Amino acid sequence: MKKLILVTSPPACGKTFISKQLAKALNHVVYLDKDTLIPLSKQIFAVAHQPYDRSSIFFEKYIRDLEYRVVLDLAMEALEYDDIVLINAPFTQEIRDLDYITILRAELKKKQAELVVIWVDTNPKVCHQRMIDRASDRDMWKLNHWDEYILGVNFNPPLSLKLENQPDSLLIFHNSSNEEFEESMKTIVAQLEAAVADRVEIPRTRY
């Protein structure tokens, strides 16, 4: 059984670093990052004569869902050619929408694939500092309105996604310290390796 892995969490929890390390550790992986689409999204802002603001109503209405649709279309195509596709993206709304997840799982089943959600669990104070340190233009509104922003962010894992008959349906990656990262990395790589090996013969991971 092939796997579509979504590495998800609120911004600045460490998704990108974790996603890349997981992709390096596993075999037969296609790595996709939704942020790769940002240059195209910036052009939409420019053509529409809108200020570049990924927290704006314009972004939510015309760009956000399109980015997710494109990266998922790429993932579905990639599953035709490899065993695992890993997407680095927040999916903050989608993973709380059980209808969305049900439809996605049904589409994956047609490709003999399963959905794996890896939730990156990070202390909000750590996320705030990481956001300051990375100084990205996409975080400007969040940092300037931190108290307002943080009230609307759900840092709880989406436990409703856990399936009894699929142990790797929801995996929690703790990432508030280097020690948590190392322990979670070893544990989750082993879980993913075992889940894929149960169905597909692949070499051992390199982690």
Residue ranges and their predicted role:
Residues 109-131:
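Conserved phosphate-donor/acceptor-positioning beta-strand/loop module used by diverse small-molecule
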Residues 7:
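Hydrophobic anchor at the beta1->P-loop junction of P-loop NTPases
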Residues 14:
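Conserved glycine(s) of the Walker
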Residues 10-11:
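The conserved Walker
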Residues 62-111:
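Glycine-rich phosphate-binding loop used to anchor ATP phosphates in small-molecule kinases
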Residues 1-4, 82-83:
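Pre-Walker A (Motif I) flank of P-loop NTPase domains
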Residues 17-70, 76:
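Conserved substrate/cofactor phosphate-moiety recognition/catalytic segment
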Residues 121, 132-185, 203-207:
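Small-molecule kinase domains that catalyze NTP-dependent phosphoryl transfer to phosphate-bearing small molecules
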